[in-house]
């Protein structure tokens, strides 16, 4: 329908809730396959997302986008971050890179700031990880350029985890 779309989460972007936005993988634990579903035109890509895929993906979970040899969990040696860069995504790996992104000059933004889930907000190092509010604001600024509108899935995933642990 022409809407821009994105996901923002303090959990891994391959975790169940954000993954349901863009992936048709049958099991939530298949996070390598879920990550591959984000790369437009790549093996495992969810073609229901159209030719260009999501415009914004921000959160945790870098391990599912990088191969074993680079410290990730991908056994297929695919470097999905490099593949996304090749598809014209602006990539931010830390809060400094993220803050430097100009939404007016950015059409596609990908940022996974931690290997797994992002830190609880009380433990977050602001130099390494943007906050949920910062990610959401930047995502909205990028997506709002689409005159037809946008859909943005925002999840405070770490509050869910804290509640599971009864540490909220």
Regions found by a protein language model. Give the residues of each.
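Catalytic cores of secreted/periplasmic or lumenal enzymes
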Residues: 134-135, 165
């Amino acid at each position: 329908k022409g809407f821009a779309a994105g996901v923002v989460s303090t959990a891994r972007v391959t975790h169940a809730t954000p993954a349901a936005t863009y992936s048709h993988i049958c099991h939530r634990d298949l996070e390598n396959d879920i990550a591959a579903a984000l790369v437009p035109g790549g093996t495992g890509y969810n073609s229901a997302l159209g030719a260009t895929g999501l415009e914004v993906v921000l959160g945790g979970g870098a391990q599912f986008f990088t191969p074993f040899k680079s410290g990730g969990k991908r056994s297929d040696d695919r470097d999905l971050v490099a593949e996304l860069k090749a598809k014209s995504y602006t990539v931010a790996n830390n809060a400094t890179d993220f803050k430097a992104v100009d939404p007016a000059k950015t059409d596609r933004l990908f940022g996974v700031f931690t290997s797994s889930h992002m830190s609880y907000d009380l433990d977050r190092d602001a130099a390494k990880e943007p906050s949920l509010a910062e990610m959401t604001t930047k995502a909205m600024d990028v997506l709002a350029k689409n005159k037809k509108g946008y859909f943005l899935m925002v999840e405070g995933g770490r509050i869910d985890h804290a509640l599971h642990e009864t540490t909220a």
